[in-house]
């Protein structure tokens, strides 16, 4: 061990552990599929595996991978927060020198296909415009912390948004607009209250909360007469926190994907202001607005 350095922090695990699980309803024979990417990170009395090459305290990452697969086979995975918590608790309970586990799950969304006007029993279509994630940490003797996410939802509205009365200086060239296209890719994290026990956590309907967070986000985006991205994202977060007492904090990152008016004056065509109907999508640069709203 060096006399001048020490291990300030360490964790290790397995990433990109992918699986798809198929559930079949005994009554209807209807199939449901769940595709997930899982990452595990363990913490505890691990310093000597770094400083003294002591592998006796290393639970192999391959063991962690196998554990994830066995737990996926033998347990319900339909609620990713609960599945992640069960895995995290297992790692800490089983290995005495492991005192914490962080599990991250990313869900690949498959939507049931409609065929001849009816939901098909075993055919699905990939929904590329939405990513659900969860991050669950279990600490020995302290309980669970859960942060879930809605990401990669690309939205646009063609009116109902403006940007005026902003600060101006010698570097300002942006004109004020009372009507503009508002487009963004939604990135939302929502943090739950601390859970002392697995039983308390398992009693929460995380799936319906996820759907409601998405509904509030999209409804606010569509209905708000937006004066700025900042004002709209605050309304989204404020509504979520006031709807769910179990959610203590909401974070949004909303890149402002610009669509600018195309100047057709050289062709004697007015395509500016209220006469604008033709826009040029801008790949970059884009605005990038973030906000974390917390319960008082």
UniProtKB/Swiss-Prot annotation:
Subcellular location field: Peroxisome; Cytoplasm; Nucleus
Biochemical pathway: Purine metabolism; urate degradation; (S)-allantoin from urate: step 1/3
InterPro entries, per database record: Uricase, Uricase_CS
SUPFAM superfamilies on file: Tetrahydrobiopterin biosynthesis enzymes-like
Transmembrane segments: none
Active-site feature positions: 14, 61, 258
Pfam families noted in UniProt: Uricase
Annotated residues for binding of urate: 61-62, 163, 180, 229-230, 256
Origin: domain of life: Eukaryota
Gene Ontology molecular-function annotations: urate oxidase activity
Catalytic function, reaction form: urate + O2 + H2O = 5-hydroxyisourate + H2O2
GO biological process: purine nucleobase catabolic process; urate catabolic process; urea metabolic process
Keyword set, alphabetical order: Cytoplasm, Nucleus, Oxidoreductase, Peroxisome, Purine metabolism
Record GO cellular component, one term: peroxisome
Gene3D superfamilies on file: Urate Oxidase
EC number annotated for this UniProt entry: 1.7.3.3
The family this protein is said to belong to: Belongs to the uricase family.
Role description: Catalyzes the oxidation of uric acid to 5-hydroxyisourate, which is further processed to form (S)-allantoin.
Protein name: Uricase
Species this chain originates from: Schizosaccharomyces pombe (strain 972 / ATCC 24843)
């Amino acid at each position: 061990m060096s006399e001048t350095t020490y291990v300030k922090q360490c964790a290790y695990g397995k990433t990109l552990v992918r699986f798809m699980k198929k559930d079949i309803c005994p009554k209807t024979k209807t199939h449901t599929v769940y595709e997930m990417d899982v990452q595990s990170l363990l913490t505890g009395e691990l310093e000597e595996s770094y400083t003294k090459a002591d592998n006796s305290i290393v639970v192999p990452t391959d063991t962690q991978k196998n554990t994830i697969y066995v737990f996926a086979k033998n347990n319900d995975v339909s609620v990713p927060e609960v599945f992640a918590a069960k895995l995290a608790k297992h790692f800490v309970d089983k290995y005495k020198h492991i005192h914490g586990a962080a599990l991250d799950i990313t869900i690949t969304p498959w939507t049931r296909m409609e065929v001849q006007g009816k939901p098909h029993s075993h055919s699905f279509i990939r929904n590329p415009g939405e990513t659900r994630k969860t991050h669950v940490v279990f600490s020995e003797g302290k309980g669970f912390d859960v942060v879930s996410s809605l990401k990669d939802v690309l939205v646009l509205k063609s009116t109902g948004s403006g940007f005026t009365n902003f600060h101006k200086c010698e570097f300002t060239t942006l004109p004020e607009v009372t009507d503009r296209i508002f487009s963004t890719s939604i990135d939302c994290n929502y943090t739950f209250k601390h859970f002392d026990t697995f039983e308390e956590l398992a009693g929460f309907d995380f799936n319906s909360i996820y759907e409601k967070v998405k509904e509030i986000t999209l409804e606010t985006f569509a209905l708000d007469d937006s004066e700025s991205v900042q004002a709209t994202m605050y309304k989204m977060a404020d509504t979520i926190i006031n709807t769910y007492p179990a959610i203590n904090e909401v974070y949004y990152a909303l890149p402002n994907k610009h669509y600018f008016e195309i100047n057709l004056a050289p062709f004697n065509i007015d395509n500016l202001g209220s006469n604008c109907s033709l826009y040029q999508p801008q790949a970059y640069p884009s605005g990038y607005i973030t906000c974390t709203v917390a319960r008082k």
